[in-house]
Every structure is written in C-alpha cells, then in structure tokens.
Regions:
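Beta-rich interaction/scaffold domains
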Residues: 1-184
Length: 184
C-alpha cells in the first residue's frame, strides 16, 4: 500500500542527517491500521502526510570546523615570510559555504587543501646584505698589516648561508660578529 511504501521510504533515511526529523516520526506514528475500503481517502491522506513530511526535511549543515581552523592557521601566518603564498590564498578563497551534511566530504577536502597549501609553503631566504658588506670590508683590508687577523677570519668562516627569513637575527649577528672582529 501507499502507506507501507511511505513508511519504507522514511525508514531508509538517516534521521541524524536532518535538522528536524520529528515531523516524519509523528506522521509514521499517526498511522492507524485496520481501516476498511470505505476509509481509503483517510489511508491515502496518511501516506500523503508521511510523503509531505519527508519532502519537508532539511539536511543539517556540513561541519566547517576543520575549514575554519585551517583558515585561522593560514591567517596567523605572515605571508611576507614565504616565497609564494598564493596557493594558500587560493585554497582559502575556494571555500564554498552553505554545504549540507551530505556534502561533508567536499567540505573536508576544502580544509585539506588549505592544510596542504600551508604545509607546502617555503620560507624566503634571509637577507645577507649586511654580511656581504662586512665581508667586503674584510676583503679590502690587508691582513699583513695586522698582528692577529684570525678573529676576523674566524668570524667570516662562521657565516652559514642556509638561513631563512625567520632566522634573520642570526644572520644579523653574523654580520655584527665580523664588524666586531674588524674593530678589535
């Protein structure tokens, strides 16, 4: 019967996916069996009530918590520290709001895209201008004119060229060490 078909349709639905499933449950619970053929219009109305309740269901919203956390992480970064921040910006800009729970995998993919873009970021190199200027001063000196030039040479040899922008203070300290060794 139409009522049984409507009940079967309601039973296959996952009520956890909907904002309010009570209308469907109420319609199913309101079924009165043992009607005779003269009461067919009432039976048809029961089936229609269930169908209408199913059609009125609204999916719950997708959970954007991971997306929001990834966006917050991206926003906390100083984009000027990275060689190319555009992939992160593109992933954040690609977020589409308003998805429902049946589209959760798409929402999760948006969060993953942002996280992956953040993971792929590469820091800019540190600025070695001051170090290079200090070394140029050293190269202009005649080391034979000094009693002990080893401190200057040690300071120059201590320079490491693999620092990134977050380690700028270490690079600046290398330049200062060379300058201090020259004045000593």
């Amino acid at each position: 019967t139409k009522v049984d078909a409507a009940i079967a349709k309601a039973n296959v639905l996952n009520k956890d996916n909907y904002k309010d499933f009570s209308g469907v449950e109420a319609a199913v619970n309101a079924i009165v069996r043992d009607k005779n053929i003269t009461e067919q219009s009432e039976v048809d109305a029961m089936a229609k009530t269930i169908e209408d309740a199913i059609n009125a269901l609204v999916y719950k919203d997708a959970d954007y918590t991971k997306v929001d956390e990834a966006i917050a992480k991206a926003n906390a970064l100083n984009k000027d520290n990275y060689k190319d921040f555009s992939a992160v910006e593109a992933a954040v800009n690609a977020v589409v709001r308003g998805k429902n729970i049946t589209e959760q995998s798409e929402v999760d993919a948006m969060a993953k895209a942002i996280e992956d873009a953040i993971t792929a970021l590469v820091y800019k190199d540190a600025d070695y201008t001051k170090v290079d200027e200090a070394i140029a001063k050293v190269n202009a000196l005649k080391k034979d004119n000094y009693k002990d030039f080893s401190g200057v040479e040690a300071a120059v040899n201590a320079v490491k060229r693999d620092k990134n922008v977050t380690e700028q203070s270490e690079v600046d300290a290398m330049a200062k060490a060379i300058e201090d060794a020259i004045t000593a």
